[in-house]
Amino acid sequence: MIEQQKRKGPELPLVPVKRQRHELLLGAAGSGPGAGQQQAAPGALLQAGPPRCSSLQAPIMLLSGHEGEVYCCKFHPNGSTLASAGFDRLILLWNVYGDCDNYATLKGHSGAVMELHYNTDGSMLFSASTDKTVAVWDSETGERVKRLKGHTSFVNSCYPARRGPQLVCTGSDDGTVKLWDIRKKAAIQTFQNTYQVLAVTFNDTSDQIISGGIDNDIKVWDLRQNKLTYTMRGHADSVTGLSLSSEGSYLLSNAMDNTVRVWDVRPFAPKERCVRIFQGNVHNFEKNLLRCSWSPDGSKIAAGSADRFVYVWDTTSRRILYKLPGHAGSINEVAFHPDEPIILSASSDKRLYMGEIQ
């Protein structure tokens, strides 16, 4: 297990955009982890800021321990733990509450881990890697229970089915989208694209796979008919992140054209499926696969950004609710806690932050 340097973040409120509060600066570039941070005794009362709205030990918690860029992060469905992974090939498991201890390290990938997902009940954790494989882990024991081999290049994305038999879809630089049943050795279906696939997800009923890649298009593949059903066009650059809303009607996409879009993926939706466009976050020369996510109730969305800020928008008004500073590198993924108003961010600065949002 790697030795982690766990520190609490500064005990200041996260600052919503356009609200008059004192400026929040968390470990700006060059200041190093923990620079100027105040340590509080466990259970200490906070003297300033708005009332607390979560069960975190402090309004902002810093999780450090990764030895390279952190590409992905996810809360366990029960909300008590989280997983993170990235360039150092390790998957770190953390407690959400208390001191946010890094209580386990999952080793097995020989390349960077590009994406992580828990299945619906949280019993399994899926990881996609540049070692051309997807690993399936028992989230209780930390044991790797399956290794899915078949891609011939980097696996950029994976997503487990929400219900039914444990299926998982994957997307790779080899241009294919694959469907796997983890009870079987090889992929059970393969869809060929002309270009690299950067992001995949299932629709709500898991009879379609949705993929995005460097051809700028979002494709919907029908598993029963084994063919491309329709294509959603609108992005002007590579699609790097996809996320299905909790009720399954809308798809969120993040792309290198510096827009985040919401698409209506219901079966009989109008032909023009793009229903919202959000702006503010940016991609840059690093070309990281910046992901995106929905809040559990669908009222907010969040996206990774190369300008070192976490962006959170109101889904209806499209207004930026929060532009959160703190990281010293590209923010690659942002995740919402399943039960509490907590947001988690993973960054190329090797760190994660957890913070309360009102």
Swiss-Prot record:
Subcellular localization is given as: Nucleus
Chain positions with Asymmetric dimethylarginine modification: R21
Q: Where is this cross-link: Glycyl lysine isopeptide (Lys-Gly) (interchain with G-Cter in SUMO2)?
A: K18, K271
Question: Mind naming one GO cellular-component term on file for this protein?
Answer: catalytic step 2 spliceosome
Q: Provide this UniProt record's keywords sorted from A to Z.
A: Isopeptide bond, Methylation, mRNA processing, mRNA splicing, Nucleus, Repeat, Spliceosome, Ubl conjugation, WD repeat
A Gene Ontology biological process in which this protein takes part is: mRNA processing
Q: List each coiled-coil range.
A: none
Q: Where are the WD repeats?
A: 65-104, 108-147, 150-190, 192-231, 234-273, 284-323, 326-358
Q: Which PROSITE patterns match?
A: WD_REPEATS_1, WD_REPEATS_2, WD_REPEATS_REGION
Quaternary organization: Component of the pre-catalytic and catalytic spliceosome complexes. Component of the postcatalytic spliceosome P complex. Part of the U5 snRNP complex. Interacts with PRPF8. Component of the U4/U6-U5 tri-snRNP complex composed of the U4, U6 and U5 snRNAs and at least PRPF3, PRPF4, PRPF6, PRPF8, PRPF31, SNRNP200, TXNL4A, WDR57, SNRNP40, DDX23, CD2BP2, PPIH, SNU13, EFTUD2, SART1 and USP39. Component of the minor spliceosome, which splices U12-type introns.
What is the recorded function of this protein according to its Swiss-Prot or TrEMBL entry?
Required for pre-mRNA splicing as component of the activated spliceosome. Component of the U5 small nuclear ribonucleoprotein (snRNP) complex and the U4/U6-U5 tri-snRNP complex, building blocks of the spliceosome. As a component of the minor spliceosome, involved in the splicing of U12-type introns in pre-mRNAs.
Q: Which PANTHER family match?
A: U5 SMALL NUCLEAR RIBONUCLEOPROTEIN 40 KDA PROTEIN
Q: What is this protein called?
A: U5 small nuclear ribonucleoprotein 40 kDa protein
Q: Which organism is it from?
A: Bos taurus (Bovine)
Highest classification ranks of the organism: Eukaryota, Metazoa, Chordata, Craniata, Vertebrata
